[in-house]
């Protein structure tokens, strides 16, 4: 059985809410100067690796601590045996300096230099730029060994990945949308969903009342379903004062028959002075004698029963 690999962060036993956000001066004085002098740290937060052997996206897994930025102590090699230029080749690409070096001072004394670098994939000078950034901290007077290939025994590096402009814009849009929703979006959205739910339930009630089974060939298509409206009070009282639009059923090449159930109400309909009484809803077909000028209207009486009156058009009022 192999040894179980321990989580470096779990071994640190850090208190809840601990954060590591040192300033440039603290990194230089409290960490790099002490590391170069051979001092040990009671709490190891910065890993020791040869940073230039890895691609930057591999480095977070080798850090001891950090979520969005990671810190490392690393040696820095010479590009040429007797030269003073550092070797910037790393992994599948290279680090390229950008911007102006910043001098770090403490108590009026200069102690180090901060340099910013960007990682490029490929070979210089035609590499592809990435969003990986390094801040390299080095001492002004490093300890150098004659004949050594190392330019510095230790430099301190901060690694992080910069957000693109598109990522920043997406984040800003998300935050703006969240604020708008919290201010007025929730009430508007809630009302809209309630209105949709009411209409959907009314369509289901209408199908059940007319005896349509789910998936039945006699079920009215959506475009031929009665349209419930209330021009007075919005959607309050929809169930009490329905208005059905049956105009689309007239003149169709194929009009579905309306199936009857034993509980369907009685409806009176007629033409002019002639009225007829029938039990249930009339059946319509292509040879129907009912024209667009004929019609009937229903008014609820005695609970479930209906009595009709002549209407100017064809449809429920």
UniProtKB/Swiss-Prot annotation:
One of its GO terms (molecular function) is DNA binding. One of its GO terms (cellular component) is nucleus. Keywords: DNA-binding, Nucleus, Transcription, Transcription regulation. Residues 14-162 form the NAC domain. Gene3D superfamilies: NAC domain (2.170.150.80). Expressed in leaves. Signal peptide: none annotated. Residues 111-168 bind DNA. Its main location: nucleus. InterPro entries: NAC-dom (IPR003441), NAC_dom_sf (IPR036093). PROSITE patterns: NAC. Induction: Strongly induced by high salinity. Slightly up-regulated by drought, abscisic acid (ABA) and jasmonic acid. Not induced by cold treatment. GO terms for biological process: jasmonic acid mediated signaling pathway; response to water deprivation. It is found in: Nucleus. PANTHER family: NAC DOMAIN-CONTAINING PROTEIN 72-LIKE (PTHR31744:SF233), PROTEIN CUP-SHAPED COTYLEDON 2-RELATED (PTHR31744). The NAC domain includes a DNA-binding domain and a dimerization domain. Transcription factors that bind specifically to the 5'-CATGTG-3' motif. This is NAC domain-containing protein 55. The gene is NAC055.
């Amino acid at each position: 059985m192999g040894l179980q690999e321990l989580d470096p962060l779990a071994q640190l036993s850090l208190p809840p809410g601990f954060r590591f956000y040192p300033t440039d001066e603290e990194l230089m004085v409290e960490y790099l100067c002490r590391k170069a002098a051979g001092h040990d740290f009671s709490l190891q937060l910065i890993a020791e690796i040869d940073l230039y052997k890895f691609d930057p996206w591999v480095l977070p897994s080798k850090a001891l601590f950090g979520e969005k930025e990671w810190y490392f102590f690393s040696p820095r090699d010479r590009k040429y045996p007797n030269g003073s230029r550092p070797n910037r080749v790393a992994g599948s690409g290279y680090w390229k300096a950008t911007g102006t070096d910043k001098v770090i001072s403490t108590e009026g004394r200069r102690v180090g230099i901060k340099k910013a670098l960007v990682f490029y994939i490929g070979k210089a000078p035609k590499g592809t730029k990435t969003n990986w950034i390094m801040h390299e901290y080095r001492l002004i007077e490093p300890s150098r060994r004659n004949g050594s290939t190392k330019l510095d025994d230790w430099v301190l590096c901060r690694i992080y990945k910069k957000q693109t402009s598109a990522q920043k814009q997406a984040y800003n849009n998300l935050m703006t949308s969240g604020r708008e929703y919290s201010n007025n979006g929730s009430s508007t959205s809630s009302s809209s969903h309630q209105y949709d739910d009411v209409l959907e339930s009314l369509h289901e009630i209408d199908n059940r009342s007319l005896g349509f089974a789910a998936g039945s060939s006699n079920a009215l298509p959506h475009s031929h379903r009665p349209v419930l409206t209330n021009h007075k009070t919005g959607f309050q009282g929809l169930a009490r004062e329905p208005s059905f639009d049956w105009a689309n059923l007239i003149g169709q090449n194929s009009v579905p028959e309306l199936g009857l159930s034993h509980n369907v109400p009685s409806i009176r309909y007629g033409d002019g002075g002639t009225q007829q009484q029938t039990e249930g809803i009339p059946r319509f077909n292509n040879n129907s004698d009912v024209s667009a000028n004929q019609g009937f209207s229903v008014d609820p009486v005695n609970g479930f029963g209906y009595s009709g009156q002549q209407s100017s058009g064809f449809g429920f009022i």
